[in-house]
Curated annotation (Swiss-Prot):
Residues 1-35 form the signal peptide. The keyword Transferase does not apply. It comes from Bacillus subtilis (strain 168). This is Trifunctional nucleotide phosphoesterase protein YfkN. PROSITE patterns: 5_NUCLEOTIDASE_1, 5_NUCLEOTIDASE_2, GRAM_POS_ANCHORING.
């Protein structure tokens, strides 16, 4: 009974409490749950590092006086900017060797030294570092080259700390700031600010005391790097450093080093505690890299040594080092939870300069250019260092000559005046770790300061040492360590050079003669350690023809680095120095050249490699060395190396450089050839120089051209080929064949060319144009029925090679070459009939069949057995021709612009050599053919080469004089008006490389039109970087067109699958953030992309125009013909997919001519527009509360640059289950409102699109909502509810119409569809205004937000009846009186497209934000309580509980009373 009463009592209590508890659950605020709040905060910190910049601020090679893409901080800074955009938590540091190393650094010392020391001027390089906002830096060994005063002044100008812990005063105190600890505010993964103390410490090799003895001795001392670290790092920890970064200007060895080591990174990582990251340098090497794979304690994948992340990012800004640290806070302090070191190359990743760098350094750069271009003298011979490591060399000879000249003057009145003077020099620029272009290559002629700096790279000073004969020999033994040991018994090819030996340590000593026996082991290794004490590689060491005595004394003039023992050379100690000078070696060289005025730096051959029989001593040098090897007796070119830009060469000795004389009956013929010059005459005078050189070297030679002299440059535009003809006559061509472009302007212009008729282009004949002084050979082109050309048709004829000939068109000719007959016949590609404009009367017969018949006639009728086919059918067809037609000895080809730089032979019973020399007169092809007495080619006695024609080739004076007349007149041609534009044509660099522009569209349209007409193309893709300027509204001149398209690129077509086209677009979009030039401007397709995704995953959709004009998704399996330019077609700008095309062809039409032709087609008046071909979209970030936000930094860039801002969602977003709530911050709204064009924001996915004009919104935090509320029985789409809120208030009506686009479920059910407003309360539909239908997408405009869907309007233009079973309520139909009609211009369609491809969905972000409708974001990672609201809720809850409690109490009392009464 008691239990029952107790249970009843409990039930009564629960009945009383339940209602208030339920009410409380509705009233009391429920805090959001964030799992991450309980976890330790994490920070992702990126350390960006540069090292060994060596004054290379600009991407400019001052020694060759031209821009380069290979190095320069101006390019590295683009990578820095990219990483800063990707991660706000970045530090930027420099690891030393910053201010010395090129003429810009030298200029600052020579002309700004006093101002820098006094502090009245900041070192220009430091100004750049300040502008880039470096966080810290350290000193490299070369910072000490200019003395301590200059270094102090340099440091003084830095806005960032420069630290060094191991350079001390003579009393043992730190000479520089040993370390700093800076507190950084970083953002953790939850978006919260965190304070992290970052410490920086720096080190430099102790060897600076030797290398810069004259600047440092008696002033400083240098502590061992590891000792210094262990002394200093505990202090940093004690002062609270959370993270310690070692800026270590020291290299990486693979094992522990002894105290005082030059390269101590391994020891820092293994012998110290507390370092979290190490920046390495000094060696100019790469880490992480494969070189260190498998070495104990090295992890190449993670870029760590002993678990500590390390980077060594090469030199000169070629790479950026990146160390990523994952920091976790535990027990109040930060620890490194994970780390990774990596390096990122500018090659392939950067295609433009950083404006911050260029703007800051520009004036110094210009001053440096003026400085290096100042002439100081002349050289009678070329000076290069291509073979400086294997033979005596002019680039070293001129330096040693100058040093000896200086020493003789300095020592003539000293006690040493009677001692013999020797001079030591080394090749500073010899490829190696610095690449295939890192060689001295100075042509004969003027010598400027830049050339002196190229010959002597460093700021060394002259010093003279006194040594004995045995010490001189050891010096040379040390140098001889450069060579590998060769085993004659092994035979074959053996590499001569030791890759571990630095070229600047290979000293040649002039004044003595000697040989190097490389069959013996080296006495010293690359560090100067004795490894074979009894070995002696130096043989026949003599002075003035007599063997050197070990005790004989010599003076050797060298530099301060070597005289102080630099490089580990034996015997070179300070007591051996008898003359120390402050004069730089470079200054001595300059003074020598100035005094001599003209120098002849020919090597005196005082040293050589001793001959080795039975083996080939091979080595690598630049491919640019090949022409010099071809002329040399002691070096031969073997072939291309696997290393880019390098060739393989071999030494030739007396016993193998002169092969056996040819067998009786062999006859040699040298055939020089060009093809596809396309009116590129700028280097024609240089071409003539090369031709004359070959003629002077050979006895039997002819000169041929394989066609396409026409079309491609202004010279043709102005003179229709007659300027080319003038130059060809001067050069003495023996024959040419027709290319397809010879027919571009029809028979009339070709007839003028064949007759020299200048009536059209030069009526007064000021240029004295004449007919060709050579015949045209054309066996398969029949012009006999063409009235303009038939008079030129001739029968086969014999001409004397090298003499003037009568013009005419012959099927073949015979050339009499010193009594030997050589037949030449011509072939032209058969598709010329459709790809050019020959007219209907000219017939192009089958090339192979014609060749068969022609060869037969030559052999049987002419009895000639030496036959050359001069063809314009393409390289692959040339190879096929050789296989199909017997009897051809040599094919000189054209059409495909192929560079054949090594012998290609097809054996068809007898061999046929196939050649082609690329394009535009860039090369002179040369084939040296050896025939036996039967006319059969002896390929083993024949040779093929291509001779480059570039700035290193002198211009023939006579040809130059003729050419200059044409060049001068072309300046007037450039002012010729070619059209008019009603709008400015946007070629702004920042636009054409990031988005669709009207100029990009116009160019792509012209390319597509021409390629469609000539080759059936359907698509055009061109690189935005090829558009170099815009054109203002008004008249368009030819000069402006050439400024837009200055490269003279030609039209190229390639057959690509849909998959490859998408890949091409991905390649074009891979480097947009850095201003890469590959950005694809297009015609014939539309594409959508986002930069939120990584390269390779940026293209979301590609559509192509179908034959009926619709835009349909591109089929990945179908093949399409794509038009582009020849640069992109060859894989340029990273478009490698074009090189994989199933078919590729250069149509030869030059870009600016296509541009002007497009103008003519449009009536010379144009107004191109941005049409929406290219759509860049922004992917929002989904927060944990389900809302979406826009990344502030990335969206700020996007909102400014995009043509139309789009926010793109996945296919399922906006559904009933996944409503969209996009929160746009106040600053983001402001950015959108400030846009000059189309200030709007469009949200879209596959099913819908909404475009909101910013005029409808105030500058405030905004929340935009889209949600599917299901579908109606009568609707053709879901019903969507659109909302927008600002400051917590819903905005119902708008000033400007909002565009809505919805996609239908089934287009088959559509009958006059339109978008309708759904008013559930009134059970009514209202049609939106200005509707349109595009396939299955329906668009309408409204001035208020509510629910909308697609309905059929029917034939009476009325909607169906409102379904009776649909719920009512919700929308009351009152939207502030807003109508559904847009006022003003109708916005463009903003519909989306296909669903987001895999891997491109917006990613979930970290950090939460507020719920509710205001759209304002709370603090990332959690919500602070709303105190006022909470207190109010608590008071209200208390009141309700009291009231309810009282009511329940009274109710229970009444019941009890009734029970008692009962």
């Amino acid at each position: 009974m008691r239990i029952q009463k107790r249970r009843t009592h409990v039930e009564n209590i629960l009945r009383i409490l339940l209602p208030p508890i339920m009410i409380l659950s509705l009233i009391l605020p429920t805090p959001p749950i964030h799992a991450e709040e309980s976890a330790a905060p994490q920070v992702h910190l990126s350390i960006l590092a540069t090292t060994d910049i060596h004054a290379n601020m600009m991407d400019y090679d001052y020694y060759s006086d031209k821009e380069t893409a290979d190095f320069g901080l101006a390019r590295t800074a683009q990578l820095i900017q990219k990483h800063r955009e990707q991660n706000p938590n970045t530090l930027l540091v420099d690891n030393g060797d910053l201010i010395q190393g090129n003429p810009l650094g030298e200029y600052a010392v020579k002309y700004q030294k006093d101002d820098i020391i006094s502090g009245t001027k900041t070192h220009p390089i430091i100004s750049v570092m300040n502008a880039l906002k470096y966080d810290a830096g350290t000193l490299g060994n070369h910072e000490f080259n200019y003395g301590l005063d200059f270094l102090d002044g340099t440091i003084k100008g830095a806005d960032f700390p420069i630290v060094n812990a191991n350079v001390k005063t003579t009393s043992g105190e730190n000479r520089y700031t040993p370390y700093v600890i800076n507190e950084k505010t970083l953002i953790d993964e939850n978006g919260n600010e965190q304070k992290v103390k970052v410490g920086y410490i720096g080190f430099v090799p102790p060897q600076i005391m030797t290398w810069d003895k004259k600047n440092l001795e008696g002033q400083v001392q240098v502590q061992d790097i590891v000792e210094s670290a262990n002394e200093t790092i505990p202090k940093m920890k004690a002062e609270g450093a959370d993270v310690i970064i070692a800026l270590a200007h020291t290299g990486i060895e693979k094992q522990a080093q002894s105290s005082g080591a030059e390269n101590a990174v391994f020891d820092l990582a293994t012998k110290t505690k507390g370092i979290d990251a190490i920046i390495s340098g000094h060696q100019h090497g790469l880490f992480p890299s494969a070189e260190y794979a498998g070495v104990a304690q090295f992890n190449v994948e993670k870029g760590t040594i002993n678990g500590i992340p390390v980077v060594m990012p090469s030199s000169w800004g070629k790479y950026l080092g990146v160390i990523d640290l994952k920091l976790e806070k535990a027990d109040g302090s930060w620890k490194v939870a994970d780390s990774k070191g990596s390096i990122e190359s500018i090659a392939g990743n950067v295609t433009s300069r950083n404006e911050t760098v260029t703007n800051t350094i520009q004036q110094t750069h210009q001053n440096t250019l003026e400085y290096v271009r100042k002439p100081v003298g002349k050289t009678e011979a070329d000076i290069n260092s291509f073979f400086a490591q294997v033979k005596d060399d002019p680039s070293i000879q001129i330096v040693t000559d100058a040093q000896k000249w200086y020493a003789e003057k300095e020592m003539k009145d000293t006690e040493y005046k009677n001692l013999p003077i020797l001079s030591a020099g080394a090749p500073f620029k010899a490829g190696g770790r610095n690449g295939a272009n890192y060689y001295t290559n100075i042509p004969a002629g003027d010598l400027a300061i830049k050339n002196v700096g190229d010959l002597y790279l460093y700021d060394n000073t002259v010093q003279i040492v006194k040594l004995t004969g045995s010490e001189v020999k050891d010096w040379l033994e040390m140098s001889a360590g450069q060579f590998n040991q060769i085993d004659p018994a092994k035979g074959g090819d053996q590499a001569l050079l030791n890759e571990n030996f630095r070229s600047y340590n290979f000293d040649v000593i002039d004044g003595v003669t000697y040989q190097v026996d490389v069959t013996k082991p080296a006495k010293y290794n690359e560090n100067g350690k004795v490894i074979n004490a009894d070995s002696s590689r130096i043989i026949n060491l003599s002075y003035e023809g007599k063997p050197i005595s070990p005790s004989q004394e010599f003076l050797v003039v060298t530099n301060n680095y070597r005289a102080s023992g630099g490089g580990g050379f034996p015997h070179l100690t300070s007591d051996k120095i008898v003359h120390g000078s402050a004069v730089e070696n470079r200054q001595v060289l300059m003074d020598y050249i100035i005094e001599q005025k003209t120098v002849n730096p020919k090597a005196d051959n005082n040293w050589s490699i001793a001959p080795v029989s039975g083996t080939n001593l091979t080595f690598e040098s630049s491919l640019l060395a090949k022409p010099f090897a071809d002329k040399a007796d002691d070096v031969a070119y073997v072939g291309k190396s696997a290393n880019e830009g390098y060739g393989v060469y071999k030494l030739q000795f007396d016993d193998d450089s002169n092969p056996d004389p040819p067998k009786d009956g062999l006859w040699d013929l040298t055939v020089m050839h060009t093809n596809d010059t396309h009116a590129h005459l700028d280097d024609a005078a240089r071409r003539m120089t090369k031709i004359n050189e070959v003629r002077s070297e050979t006895n039997h030679n002819i000169l041929l051209d394989a066609g396409d002299v026409f079309s491609g440059d202004l010279y043709f535009t102005k003179w229709n080929g007659l300027a080319d003809l003038k130059m060809m006559n001067m050069m003495g061509y023996d024959a040419m064949t027709f290319g397809n472009h010879e027919f571009d302007k029809g028979p009339t212009v070709l007839s003028d060319f064949l007759s020299g008729n200048s009536a059209t282009v030069d009526p007064a004949n000021r240029y004295h144009f004449e007919a060709p002084e050579f015949p045209i050979v054309s066996a398969n082109v029949d012009v006999s029925n063409e009235p303009k050309l038939k008079s030129f048709v001739k029968k086969p004829q014999t001409f004397t090679a090298g003499e003037k000939k009568e013009a005419g068109i012959h099927p073949y000719i015979l050339l009499d070459v010193d009594g030997e007959k050589v037949a030449v016949f011509g072939l032209t590609t058969e598709d010329t009939a459709t790809t050019s404009s020959p007219g209907k009367s000219i017939v192009f017969n089958d090339a192979f069949e014609t060749a068969q018949n022609t060869v037969k006639a030559i052999q049987e009728e002419e009895k000639v057995n030496k036959i050359i086919a001069l063809t314009h059918i393409g390289h692959n067809r040339d190879l096929e021709l050789a296989k199909k037609v017997k009897g051809i000895d040599l094919i000189i080809g054209g059409h495909t612009h192929t560079l054949v730089d090594k012998m290609e032979v097809v054996n068809n019973e007898e061999p046929t050599i196939v050649a082609q020399a690329k394009e535009y007169g860039q090369f002179l092809g040369r084939v040296d053919v050896a025939f036996d007495e039967k006319g059969v080619v002896q390929t083993d006695k024949s040779n093929l080469s291509v001779l480059p024609i570039d700035e290193h080739t002198e211009e023939n004076p006579e040809a130059k004089q003729e050419l200059d007349q044409f060049k001068n007149e072309l300046e007037d041609v450039k002012n010729e008006k070619v059209g008019y534009t009603d709008v400015a044509l946007d070629g702004q660099r920042e636009h054409v490389r990031t988005k669709e522009t009207n100029l990009g569209n116009f160019i792509a349209d012209g390319m597509l039109a021409k390629a469609k007409e000539a080759a059936g193309a359907r698509i055009a893709i061109t690189n935005g970087g090829g558009i170099r300027a815009g054109i203002d509204k008004g008249d368009i001149t030819l000069g402006e067109v050439l400024n837009v398209m200055p490269f003279g690129n030609t039209l190229y077509v390639a057959d690509l699958t849909g998959k490859q086209i998408k890949e091409a677009l991905e390649q074009g979009l891979s480097n947009v953030e850095n201003g890469g030039g590959a950005f694809p401007q297009v015609a014939g397709i539309e594409y959508t992309f986002t930069l939120n995704n990584k390269p390779g995953h940026r293209v979301l959709e590609v559509k192509i125009e179908s034959p009926n004009g619709d835009k349909v998704a591109i089929n990945t399996d179908d093949t399409y013909r794509v038009a582009t330019n020849n640069f992109v077609g060859a894989g340029g700008d990273g478009y490698s997919v074009f090189t994989e095309a199933s078919h590729g062809e250069d149509l030869g039409y030059v870009d600016y001519e296509i541009f002007t032709e497009q103008l003519k087609k449009l009536g010379n008046k144009v107004s191109p527009k941005v049409e929406g071909r290219i759509k860049e979209v922004f992917l929002p970030t989904k927060q944990k509360d389900g809302s979406w936000t826009l990344d502030e930094d990335k969206f700020a860039i996007y909102a400014k640059n995009a043509n139309t801002p789009f926010v793109y969602y996945g296919i399922h977003e906006g559904s009933q289950e996944k409503p969209i709530n996009l929160k746009v911050k106040k600053d983001q709204v402001k950015l959108l409102k400030e846009r000059e064009s189309d200030p709007s924001l469009t949200m879209f996915n596959y099913w819908y699109s909404m475009k909101m004009p910013m005029a409808n919104l105030k500058t405030a935090d905004t929340a935009i909502g889209i949600k599917s509320t299901g579908e109606l029985d009568v609707s053709l789409s879901d019903v969507y509810d659109f909302t927008v809120k600002q400051k917590g208030k819903e905005i119902k009506s708008f000033k400007e119409p909002v565009q809505l686009s919805l996609r239908m479920f089934d287009i088959e059910e559509a009958h006059n569809p339109a978008i309708y407003h759904v008013d559930r309360k009134k059970k009514a539909f209202t049609k939106t205004g200005h509707g349109s239908v595009d396939d299955d997408m329906v668009t309408g405009y409204t001035n208020h937000f509510s629910e909308y869907t697609i309905l059929n309007s029917g034939s009476n233009n009325k909607p169906p009846a409102f379904p009776s079973d649909q719920p009512t309520g919700g929308d009351d139909g009152n939207h502030g009186g807003g109508s559904d009609k847009p006022g003003g211009k109708q916005p463009t369609d903003g519909n989306g497209g296909n669903d987001t491809p895999p891997g491109t969905q917006p990613t979930n972000g970290s950090g939460g934000n507020g719920s509710g409708g205001s759209g304002t974001d709370g603090p990332a990672g959690g919500l602070l309580p709303d105190t006022a609201t909470s207190m109010y809720s608590i008071l209200l809850a208390g009141f309700l509980i009291s009231a309810l409690g009282t009511a329940m109490y009274l109710h229970q009392r009444r019941k009890q009373n009734r029970a008692n009464q009962a």
